[in-house]
């Protein structure tokens, strides 16, 4: 498992933009809710720790992970958040259902990112066992929800700066690099 030697909840707040002015959409699967609610807690804790306001966080529930795609699409269209976080958990069983759902959700979220101006963050646990999911949703490996929240803040900031055209702030435009709170992000020409 890739996270065996990494705590997903660790981040350096000094490297993350302030989230106060961003609107966050969260679409969460009700399936495996004992896992997804843990991921949601990690998302909320990290967002608020980085300045997000509760009034700027919208939550929608969907029945399962496959429905995350439609939920995120509709949230983007109707709520106009700066970023959407999709939260789900698929645990491998005895049939091919696991592979089909994981592939479909992965491709669907990828498609939203390609076709929409709003970033969609992929917080879908795809584990072989329930214990692996527990370990990654607030257990021994930290919380993948925390990692997703930090990615969401960074992507909302990137979107904001890209929409400004990178030239609006002299502080941001430095030798073809965008500064994210002191971290360089190289711009490809």
Swiss-Prot record:
Indicate yes or no for the key word Transferase.
yes
GO cellular component labels: cytosol; riboflavin synthase complex
The cross-references to NCBIfam families, in alphabetical order and at most eight, read:
lumazine-synth
Q: What is its EC number?
A: 2.5.1.78
GO BP terms: namely:
riboflavin biosynthetic process
What PANTHER family does this protein map onto? Answer: 6,7-DIMETHYL-8-RIBITYLLUMAZINE SYNTHASE, 6,7-DIMETHYL-8-RIBITYLLUMAZINE SYNTHASE DMRL SYNTHASE LUMAZINE SYNTHASE
Q: According to its UniProt record, what is one Pfam family this protein matches?
A: DMRL_synthase
Write down what this protein is called.
6,7-dimethyl-8-ribityllumazine synthase
Organism field:
Flavobacterium psychrophilum (strain ATCC 49511 / DSM 21280 / CIP 103535 / JIP02/86)
């Amino acid at each position: 498992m890739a996270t065996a030697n990494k705590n997903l909840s660790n981040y350096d707040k000094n490297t993350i933009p302030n989230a106060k002015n961003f609107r966050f959409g969260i679409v969460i699967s009700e399936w495996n809710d004992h896992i997804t609610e843990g991921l949601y807690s990690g998302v909320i804790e990290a967002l608020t720790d980085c300045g997000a306001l509760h009034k700027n966080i919208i939550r929608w529930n969907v029945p399962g992970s496959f429905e995350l795609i439609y939920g995120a699409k509709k949230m983007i269209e109707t709520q106009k958040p700066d970023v959407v976080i999709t939260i789900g958990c698929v645990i491998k069983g005895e049939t091919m259902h696991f592979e089909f759902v994981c592939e479909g959700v992965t491709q669907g979220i990828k498609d939203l990112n390609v076709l929409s101006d709003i970033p969609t963050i992929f917080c879908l646990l795809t584990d072989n066992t329930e214990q692996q999911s527990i370990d990654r949703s607030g257990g021994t490996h930290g919380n993948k929800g925390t990692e997703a929240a930090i990615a969401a803040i960074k992507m909302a900031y990137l979107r904001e700066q890209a929409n400004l055209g990178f030239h609006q702030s002299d502080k941001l435009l430095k030798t073809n690099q965008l500064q994210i709170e002191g971290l360089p992000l190289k711009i490809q020409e």
